[in-house]
Each structure stands twice: as C-alpha cells, then as structure tokens.
Design a protein with these regions (language model features):
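Soluble "head" domains of membrane/secretory-pathway proteins
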Residues: 2-44, 53-57, 61, 86-87, ...
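Short surface loop/edge beta-strand patches of beta-sandwich-type extracellular domains
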Residues: 91
Length: 280
C-alpha cells in the first residue's frame, strides 16, 4: 500500500490529492460495475451468446472492475479501520521521528470513524497526553503529525522553553552524554503523562552580539476547549503546531502513530530497518 507523507516542517503539508476519497470512489465504482455485471449485464451477455450461437466477449471495463474490486475493497477496509502507513518528509518531530521514517498509524485506538467524513462510529478510547497523533489541523485538509500536549480543559503555558500544564511545570532534563552530531541542536527530555518525549530546540548565534541563543518557537498561554487538543512538535523551534494555528477538534483525529517500520529518505537511497521500533 502506498504511504502518504505527513508534516513538512515549514508548511506542514503533504499532498494535494485526497487519497482516502479517491480510494473510496474507486472502490465504489468498481463495486457497482461488478455488481451490475453479476445481477444484470452478465445474464444479458449469456442470452446474447445463446441467441447468436457465439460467446459475447466480456467488456474490458467490466473485466478490470471485477479484478480490482476485491483488492480495492480490502485495502479500503484496512486503511480505514485497522492501520495506515505514512511517511515523514521533514524534521518537525525530531529527534524521535526524522525525515524518511515510515510509520504505521492505528485507526482504531481512538475509535472507528467513517472514512473520508470522520464521523465517529464506535468509541474505543481517547488521546492521552504524550501520544504521537496524526490529524487534520483546523480548516486544513492536509495531514499533520504532532504530540498531544494539552487535553480538553487544560491550561497550557510555554515560555523560555518550559512547558507548564495546569500550573505544574513539565519535568524536563538535558540529555547529557547523548552524542549530538548536528551542532545546532539542543536536546532534552520531557515527561508527558506516561510518555518520555525526546525534544529539541534550534541553537543559533545572534549576528549582532555574537551571543548564543536557543530558538524555542512561539510562546504563549492557552486554554484548551472541550472536544479539542493542543498539539506540539518535538522539534520545538521548527514546528508549525497549535501554538500558531490553534486547537485540533476531536473529529479531525486520524489515528495514533504506533511504530516505525522502515527508513527510506529518497529514491536514490537504500531502505533501512535499523530505526524500526514500537512507539511509546
């Protein structure tokens, strides 16, 4: 199954084609044609064959529809209700997820939803603080991937690289002893709920004063409305997230990222599996 890309750090977009809609339409069209042939067109060809004493050839479109419908239907069900693959094309979730990672997103962790339309069919669970989640931002049809930081009703404050939730500072410690190959990265670890999240900021030098500064991204204070979530990228200084475009409504949830199953940055590279892991 082809993997969709998610979350370009500057624009946080992936692709203009609505693949679930295309897949649903293709499945419906081939299914209707296959059903019509079973109920009516096939019988008519059989009558014509007996009348003219020769076999009437099955039209190409019917032949192809009957061949593709079972495959399309299976893919549609799996991608809609079980799991869906995505590709990470940027660094807004570094250091945990890097450009070229292929991830598997569970479609049932937060309940079963109507394909394309997003209406909840069966409620199973709710997002937890620290989950890595795929979703649609408000008023944007493109897929994003971020970490759940704020739950409905939470008071969120982010200043001087310190995250505070409901008046309590989130435990943060620098990752000492971890090799940092890129000199502009500042790494730390946050404890969000039951998750330990590795995060990073951009370290730069002020051209006017030559002083070292760490760009931690937009700061502010927010109250999460009911039925919404506050999302942040792990790469705090290079992520367009709820700090800039607001809260994610529950109906926009796509699924929970559960595993990295391959790394393949470009067509000229060889796919690797050394980053494969389950995500906490």
């Amino acid at each position: 199954m082809p993997s969709k890309q998610i979350d370009n750090s500057e624009y946080d977009d992936i692709m203009d084609i609505d693949f679930p809609l295309v897949l649903m339409v293709a499945t419906a069209v081939t299914g209707i044609i296959a059903a019509a042939d079973k109920l009516w067109l096939g019988k008519r060809r059989a009558q014509q064959s007996s009348h003219f004493d020769e076999t009437v050839k099955e039209p190409f479109i019917i032949e192809q529809s009957k061949s593709f419908f079972p495959v399309l239907a299976l893919v549609f069900v799996l991608r809609s209700f079980v799991a869906e693959p995505f590709q990470i094309p940027s660094g807004s979730m570094e250091p945990g997820l890097v450009k070229g990672d292929f991830i598997l997103v569970s479609k049932f962790h937060y309940g079963l939803r109507m394909p394309v339309f997003g209406n909840e069919l069966v409620s199973i669970g709710m997002p937890e603080r620290g989950d890595v989640m795929v979703f649609f931002p408000p008023d944007d049809p493109r897929y994003f991937i971020k970490r759940v930081v704020g739950l409905p009703g939470d008071e969120i404050v982010y200043r001087n690289r310190q995250l505070t939730i409901n008046g309590k500072e989130v435990a943060t410690e620098e990752l000492g002893g971890v090799p940092v190959y890129n000199p502009v990265r500042y790494l730390a670890q946050e404890t969000l709920g039951e998750h330990d999240a590795d995060i990073q900021w951009v370290r730069a030098r002020d051209m006017r004063t030559s002083a070292e500064v760490i760009w931690a991204g937009p700061e502010g204070q927010w109250t999460v409305p009911e039925g919404h979530y506050f999302m942040m990228g792990d790469n705090r200084g290079n992520s367009a997230d709820s700090r800039s475009w607001g809260f994610v409504p529950e109906r926009n949830i796509v699924g929970k990222a559960t595993a990295v199953w391959m790394h393949w940055e470009s067509w000229t590279d060889i796919p690797s599996f050394d980053r494969n892991r389950w995500m906490n």
